[in-house]
Design a protein with these regions (language model features):
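Helix-loop boundary and gating motifs at the non-cytosolic
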Residues: 1, 146-185, 252
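Helix-to-loop junctions at the C-terminal end of transmembrane segments
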Residues: 3-15, 94, 196-208, 294
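Hydrophobic core of transmembrane alpha-helices in multi-pass small-molecule transporters
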Residues: 30, 41-57, 155, 235-250
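Intracellular juxtamembrane helix-capping segments at the cytosolic ends
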Residues: 54-69, 250-263
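Loop-to-transmembrane helix entry/capping segments in MFS-fold secondary transporters
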Residues: 69-79, 179, 263-275
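Juxtamembrane intracellular "pre-TM" segments in multi-pass secondary transporters
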Residues: 120-151, 336
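C-terminal transmembrane helical hairpin of 12-TM major facilitator-type secondary transporters
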Residues: 211-255
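A late C-terminal transmembrane helix in Major Facilitator Superfamily
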Residues: 267-296
Length: 336
């Protein structure tokens, strides 16, 4: 979380491709560290290094996808597909070979990623950057009231959503679903976001920004309200499929559009990195409270609490001042 602004700053200074390549190279070193680590202490150290680089790279890839001459969804959807396939491959390698074999598989995929990244050419973007040499600074962002308010809203909403990744499988099992069915529901919920991403240019560039902000937050509220109330288990399954991953992805896309319209272009990556840090902070702050609710009253009390938090965020979103700038087809691509 602390490293996010730093990653954003150095990406703006030296370029997304160079810094992402460097981050992936550091991850390779971290994976070799996993293979070498003689005890839990060193495993923790290398895990921290790898996690910092992965989390620091993630928001840059979202921005990178919007800078492509192709539609955002046509690029970003491969992230969802890759995640789903990667989980299956890792599980297969783990069972067929050994736990350490997973590390070697990761090394191969990262080397392939670096090779593919080196082949990417962004000529139009590079020409624009040659003309603009303004220094990157966090100061304008700290004086940007709507941006700071937006960070608070996204941090809390994403925090509630991220807590779901931890507790929803157990919540579904607590509602009566067998373990294998609950796991299947969670796995399918990852794939459900793929069509939403693929066709994101159909609505992200055209719908009013206020609607795009309120819609995923409202869906998260409905999701946890259904969890909190004595609802049929099939309704909880449906809401899990519709909301668990899709709302998080929409919030990321909304963040990209809001920042593109509200923030100076030279600070775009830095601003997105700070938003990503706020999302982690929201999770960190809400996680112990959610755990306390579970200890005191079970998953139903936790769901009431999270529904209350996101309900407040939903109401506050209508007080957010919308940016006056234009997104200029941020998600539609510009293929010549």
């Amino acid at each position: 979380m602390v490293a996010q602004p730093f990653f954003g700053y150095i990406n703006e200074r030296f370029g997304i491709v160079k810094m992402t390549t460097l981050s992936l190279s550091v991850i390779i070193g971290g994976v070799f560290g996993f293979l070498w680590a003689p005890n839990l202490f060193w495993l923790t150290v290398f895990y921290g290094i790898v996690l910092v680089c992965l989390n620091g790279t993630a928001p840059m890839m979202e921005v990178f996808a919007t800078q492509s001459p192709y539609a955002f969804g046509k690029i970003r959807v491969w992230g969802t597909i890759g995640y789903s396939v990667g989980v299956q491959i890792a599980g297969w390698v783990y069972h067929q070979f050994s736990p350490q074999a997973v590390y070697y598989t990761v090394l191969i995929t990262i080397v392939l990623s670096i090779f593919c990244l080196s082949a990417v050419r962004m000529k139009t973007r590079e020409k624009k950057e040659e003309k603009v040499k303004e220094p990157v600074s966090i100061r304008p962002l700290l004086h940007n009231g709507p941006y700071l308010f937006f960070i608070v809203l996204i941090g809390l909403a994403s925090g509630v959503g991220n807590i779901g990744h931890t507790y929803i499988p157990e919540l579904l099992m607590d509602s009566g679903l067998p373990v294998h069915i609950a796991s299947t529901v969670v796995a399918i919920s990852v794939v459900v976001e793929a069509p939403l991403i693929f066709f994101s240019d159909r609505f992200m560039d055209h719908w009013p920004l206020r609607v795009l902000i309120a819609l995923p937050i409202g869906i998260i509220f409905a999701q946890y309200a259904i969890y909190a109330l004595p609802s049929p288990v099939f309704l909880k399954v449906i809401m899990t499929l519709l909301a668990k991953h899709t709302t998080g992805m929409v919030l990321i896309m909304v963040s990209l559009r809001f920042i593109a319209q509200q923030v100076n272009g030279k600070d775009l990556v830095l601003a997105m990195a700070i938003v990503q840090g706020a999302r982690y902070l929201g999770t960190i702050l809400l996680q112990p409270l959610a755990a306390l609710c579970i200890e005191r009253g079970g998953y139903q009390v936790m769901s009431f609490f999270l529904a209350g938090v996101v309900g407040i965020v939903f109401l506050l979103s209508f007080a957010l001042k919308m940016p006056q700038g234009k997104a200029h087809g941020l998600f539609g691509g510009k293929v010549d």
